[in-house]
Design a protein with these regions (language model features):
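Phosphate/dinucleotide-binding and metal-coordinating scaffold of catalytic cores
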Residues: 1-159
Length: 159
């Protein structure tokens, strides 16, 4: 799943209340060093559309301004991998000699889809493809935790 390209955008998919399938809510795009969000027209036209987080991303068309001091909407940053998930991704990238590409969009698009919350990030606006992780044993999980903790590269099976 790791790519050598730098991502320029990510589509934000959301599970709306009472729905079992996600819908594309909008797009997060690079704007210099910032990532800005724009709701999709089809999302805004939905009768059941809800703001992803009203203080930062109210339901309205156009690129939404960033809160002062932030380089991207905080609610979307909260939906991306935490420090441990980023550390695992860094080790995965280090194994592939492209750790320098671990920016925010890479973290969003290369982490697993089975996250807490009702958001996921995809490369497509038309097809939702979950990024699933194969189940591992408790022993394998402990082994990978020890490896990352001690700065050792993960095996391809555990990455």
């Amino acid at each position: 799943m790791t790519s050598r390209q730098r991502y320029k955008e990510a589509y934000v998919w959301a599970w709306l209340p009472g729905e079992v399938e996600p819908v594309v809510a909008g797009i997060l795009t690079k704007d210099g060093k910032n990532l800005v969000f724009n709701y999709g027209r089809s999302y805004l036209e939905r009768k059941n559309a809800i703001p992803l987080y009203t203080p930062e991303l109210p339901l309205r068309a156009g690129v939404l301004p960033l809160p002062e001091g932030l380089h991207m909407p905080g609610c979307l940053r909260d939906a991306s991998p935490d420090a441990w998930g980023r550390r695992v991704l860094m080790y995965k990238h280090a194994m592939l000699a492209n750790a320098d590409e671990l920016d925010e969009l890479t973290c969003m698009l290369e982490s697993a889809s089975n996250r807490i919350g009702a958001l996921d990030f995809q490369q497509s606006a038309t097809q939702y493809i979950p990024r699933l992780i194969e189940p591992v044993t408790l022993e394998q999980l402990q082994e990978s935790t020890d490896m990352v903790t001690h700065g050792l590269p993960l095996s391809p099976e555990l990455a």
